[in-house]
Structure formats: C-alpha cells, structure tokens
Amino acid sequence: MEPEPLDPRAIGFMRRNLAMLRQTPMSVVLAGLILLASIYFPRFMFKSQMARFPLILEHLSSEQRRARFLVGAKALYKDGSQKFRGMAYRMQTLDEQQIVLPLSALTELRKAPEEVLSFYDMFSKVVDTIKRDLTPKLTKITSKICDEVDAALDTYLPSHGKWTEINVSKTALDIIAKVSAHLFIGGDVANDPGYLECTKNFTVHLGEATRAIKVTRVWLRPFLAPRLPEVKRLLETRTKLRSYVKRVIEEREAKIKNPDWVPPDDMMQWLLDRADRQKDTLEDCTAAQVLLILGTINASMQTLIAILHTLAVTPEYVEPLREEIRNTLNSDGSIPVSAMKEFGKMDSYFKEVGMHFPVIIEPYFRRVRKGFTLSNGQYLPPGVAIVIANPLVTDSKYDTFDGFRHYKLREASAQKDKPNHRWLIANETEFRWGYDNHVCPGRFYAHNLLKIIFARIVENYDIKMPGNVEGIEARYPMVEHGNVVMEPRDKPLLLRRVKSHQGHVD
C-alpha cells in the first residue's frame, strides 16, 4: 500500500517553521534543547528504572490494570506474592505504578532515614500529645471511659429481653463517637448533637469523597475534585467542625483567667497546653480533631463491626467469653483497669478476627525521596511509592477460624514469649497497629475502648444473624474498593438483653 500524500498545508507549516529555526540564534536553540532534556530525561530515566521490576498483569493495558485494581487489590497482592515469591514487582494502582516489596525487605527499610523514605506526618503535635498525655493517663481515665460506654450502650442498644434488629455500622459509629467525644473535645460540646453528627458525618463523607476522587482521572483531579459533590460535603462538614473547635477554644481562653478553674483532662486541653499561641491554634486543633476522628472513630468503628459480624456467626464463643468477662469484674460490676490484660480469650478472639478479616492491606507505605539501593542490588528511584502487602492477605496460613488460637498459644508459651500472642503487638509480621517508629500512638486507647465496649455487649446481650444462620462462611462479606477494604454498611444483626451476673434483666 502506497503512503498517502502529505497535506499541502502541513508542508507549508513545516517550511515556515524550518525557516524560523534557521533565523533563530544557536544559543536559543541549545537553551530550548537543554530545557526539553531537563524535562523529559528524568521521566525517561524514571521509567527505565521502573521497567527493571516485573509488572503484574503485564499482558493487560494500563486501563485494564487500573480496573482490576479497583475491583480488588487484595487478590492482586495474593497473586503477586505467589508469582514473584520473595521478589519486588510493580503494580498498577488507580494513581500510579508502585513497587511492592517482599516482607523480608522490612528490616533494611526500617534503617533508612526519613529523608530517604518519607512517611507523611503533618500531625506531629497530635502524635506527641497522645504519647505524652493520653497514654500515660489511660489508667486514670479508664473508669471514666467505662462510665461513658455504659451510658452510650443504654442509649443505643435495646433494654428488653426480646430479639431486636440493629443497624450494626450505625450503632457502632454512634457508640464510639459518643464515648470518644468526651475525651476528644470535652465539655458541653461533647453532648451537642450537632458536634456528634459532624464527627460521624466526617467519617462517612471522607469515604465517599475518597472513592469519588479515586475514580477520576489523575490529570483531571486538580480541576474536577473541588467540584465533586462528595468533596463539597466533606469540606462543609469540616467547616462545621471548625466552628465547634473555635467555640471550645474561646470558652477555655476565657476560663483560664479564673485562678480557681481546673483544666479538664481531654485532648483539646492537652493540645492547647502544648500549643504555640503565636501560631494558628484554631487550625491546629481542627486538624487534630480530623486526625482523631479518622484514627480513632473510623478505625475503631471498622474493628468493632468486624468483631460483631464475626461473633454473630460463631455463637459458640459467646458463653466462654461471657464467663471470662464476668469472672473479671469488680464486685460492683465495674470493669477493673487490670482486666485490659486479663481478658485473654477476648484478646485472642480480636486477634483472630483481624487475621481473617483485615481492613488494612497496605500497612507499610513510603514515598522514596532519594534513590535507595536494596541489599539485593535493586534500585528504588526517587519519587516511587513502595508498599509491603499485609502478610495476612498473601498468606493462607490461617484458613480455619479458631477464636481461641492465640489464647492457647499464649498459655503454652514461656513468660517472655507471651506478649507476642497479644492483640496489641506490632512487629514485622503483624501490622494492624502500624510498624516501627510509625506504630499507631493511639493504639492503647483504642485497645481499651474496644475491649470495654465488647465486654459490656457480651456480658449483657446475646447476638445472632437474621435467619439464625451460623458458620464463618455465613458472615457478611467485606467490601473492596481498590486498596480499601471495609465492612459492609447498614447490615442488620439481632441483639437480646440477657440476665446480668446479678441474676436479673436490667
């Protein structure tokens, strides 16, 4: 087939440009070439360095790989682990190609300084406050948390002995938001329905906004994202949240002038005590509220839902757990602080649920700031995102659900090894709380909060699935959206108030 003749207009355009090029000084031409090289050469080098890593789903187009990631990254990580055993490989996400490293790389990655591997930490003040104020005072405030949990359960759970259907996700969010409000912001605002709605809505709206942005083309996001209705709702909720924070700051700034005023023990006051008053304290405290909502309310809600969804289909664990709980209570029915460590069967059940139904599939994520060479000689170029997949996703070690597996291992272990079987542990194989220097600072609060809520529910309620279905296969399946895995929303469970250990239905 003969080539088609060039359009005369195109020939004329080329001639004019060649003529202009002849008249352009050589220095300008060279400057232009250098500029183009400075723009495109780094991109070429980056792609060349990335191409050295094998690509999962290489036979598909980029768009098809994005679609596969969207419907379930969890399965891709498992396939990649089996195909590239112990090797690094590339995976196409919704945003970019990232490098997935084997678990064995974790030891050397932890030695890399922050200027090489970046963990974005814009909330260092909040983290510092949690470590210095919240965690050391947990023993002191645990009894207060228990009181708030009791009040919240009386409000949101049935008070009679008949089977009652509840919306698990809504109820879990109501309870955790209500209890946490007293610690996060305190005062009258903690009981303000408007503030509680803000904290609950922010959690929901963030998920909606994230999903809406993720399905938008990367290059269009700067233009379209601010116009998305989901993003607008999220920003409106944050503005309302800011107004509540402002109200509390102004009230406390006025009270501090009173020498008889005793500052409350809550996160808002601790942040104010550590704040630099020359800077924008309002914005800092609003950002802190956002972090606490995401880090505590959302994460704790997902964990509680996962545990209740599982308990409803494994009713054989209810009585042993209830017996352990009632045997640990004080004579007046209150929960002692020491129970947080004594709930061995509960601790084991929590850990087993997390192993079978993990909500975090990329527990280790870093952005490479400076080129980094692994011990096997593989070079990680600057700018690339690196992840390590949760071994619970890629490993089929725990195919059978055994709620007391870790309790039995703990009982059979030597004293020094017993902590390794606790739910609170964070190490190279268990990432539920993060890892190394970036382990979740609020894990001790979340740990205590969830155990107190669960203890009260199991102590006082029977739980089951609609239709009386049982068995782990009957459990509500988790929902996947790319690398986000979560419990399904708005699913019903049945609860029934039972006789308390004093022998009557309250």
Curated annotation (Swiss-Prot):
One MF term in the entry's GO annotations: oxidoreductase activity, acting on paired donors, with incorporation or reduction of molecular oxygen
Segments passing through the bilayer: 26-46
Consequence of gene disruption: Impairs the production of tentoxin.
Full protein name: Cytochrome P450 monooxygenase TES1
Organism of provenance: Alternaria alternata
Residues that, per the record, bind heme: 440
UniProt entry tagged with the keyword Protein biosynthesis: no
Entry-linked CDD domains: CYP503A1-like (cd11041)
Residues carrying a glycan: 167, 201, 298, 427
GO terms under cellular component: membrane
Protein's GO biological process: secondary metabolic process
Primary location: membrane
Topology within the bilayer: Single-pass membrane protein
UniProt-annotated location(s): Membrane
PANTHER family, per database record: CYTOCHROME P450, P450, PUTATIVE (EUROFUNG)-RELATED
A Pfam family the protein falls into: p450
Protein purpose: Cytochrome P450 monooxygenase; part of the gene cluster that mediates the biosynthesis of the phytotoxin tentoxin, an inhibitor the F1-ATPase activity of chloroplasts, resulting in chlorosis in sensitive plants. Tentoxin is a cyclic tetrapeptide that consists of four amino acid residues: glycine (Gly), alanine (Ala), leucine (Leu), and dehydrophenylalanine (DPhe). In addition, both the Ala and DPhe residues are N-methylated. The nonribosomal peptide synthetase TES assembles tentoxin from the four substrate amino acids.
Family, as annotated: Belongs to the cytochrome P450 family.
Enzyme Commission code: 1.-.-.-
Annotated keywords: Glycoprotein, Heme, Iron, Membrane, Metal-binding, Monooxygenase, Oxidoreductase, Transmembrane, Transmembrane helix
Associated pathway: Phytotoxin biosynthesis
Cofactor(s) this protein cannot do without: heme
